A protein has these predicted regions:
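N-terminal beta-loop-helix "entrance" segment that forms/cooperates
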Residues: 35-57
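Active-site-adjacent pocket-lining segments in enzyme domains
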Residues: 3-13, 24, 28-37, 56-58, ...
Length: 200
């Protein structure tokens, strides 16, 4: 069955992170939905660098849908919108409750996950400028970190977005699929990957 991926976007979303996640997931053959968390319901918005982003639908329209992964791009403005979106926070909470894989990069781990205490004991990374939001016991200074005990993958910023995306593919479908995606992109997965916890 085709994996379903949700990538929320909002005004101020980091464009490189969002587009890299979306593009890489499509290359893997996954069904990708981009959903706007904008408070005014608009589907078209400006990202953190002023680039226009367009969502497939409003987040509320897919709030009850099932996704294999929710992947949260960063960008301070976008992450703040995510933080303040009741719909998104509840979707993440339910996603975690169901034991599904969640990804968050850049500012999103700190401004969304930590702010709402969604993964209080999980090991994670984020953009280094937000390290102070994460408890020392939970902080991992790696470009990509997977806490398998919490099914949570986090990453640091625009420069790590491709590694993050490839590692999401590995977590979903294994390394063979990831290499099928990575090779024509002329990239090498798992260079800076750090997995914590024990697989059950």
């Amino acid at each position: 069955m085709t994996k379903r991926i949700l990538v929320p976007i909002a005004p101020g979303t980091e464009e490189m992170e969002a587009i890299t996640i979306i593009d890489t997931m499509i290359r893997a053959g996954f069904q990708v939905t981009t959903a706007s968390a904008a408070f005014d319901g608009s589907l078209t918005m400006k990202g953190s660098r002023g680039i226009t982003l367009t969502a497939d639908c409003k987040l509320v329209d897919v709030a009850d849908d099932e996704f294999d992964v929710i992947a949260l791009p960063g960008g301070i403005g976008g992450a703040e919108v995510f933080r303040d979106s009741v719909v998104l926070v509840e979707m993440v909470r339910q996603h975690k409750y169901e034991g599904k894989l969640l990804g968050a990069i850049c500012a999103a781990p700190a401004l969304v996950l930590i702010h709402h205490d969604l993964y209080p004991d999980a090991l994670m990374t984020c953009h280094p400028s937000f390290q102070s939001h994460i408890a020392d016991a939970c902080w991992r200074p790696k470009r990509v970190t997977l806490d398998v005990n919490h099914n949570l993958m986090t990453s640091q910023g625009p420069g790590t977005a491709l590694e993050f995306s490839i590692e999401l593919i590995i977590a979903l479908c294994g390394k063979e699929k990831a290499w099928q995606v990575a090779e024509p992109m002329v990239t090498n997965p798992t260079l800076h990957y750090h997995e914590m916890g024990k697989r059950t």
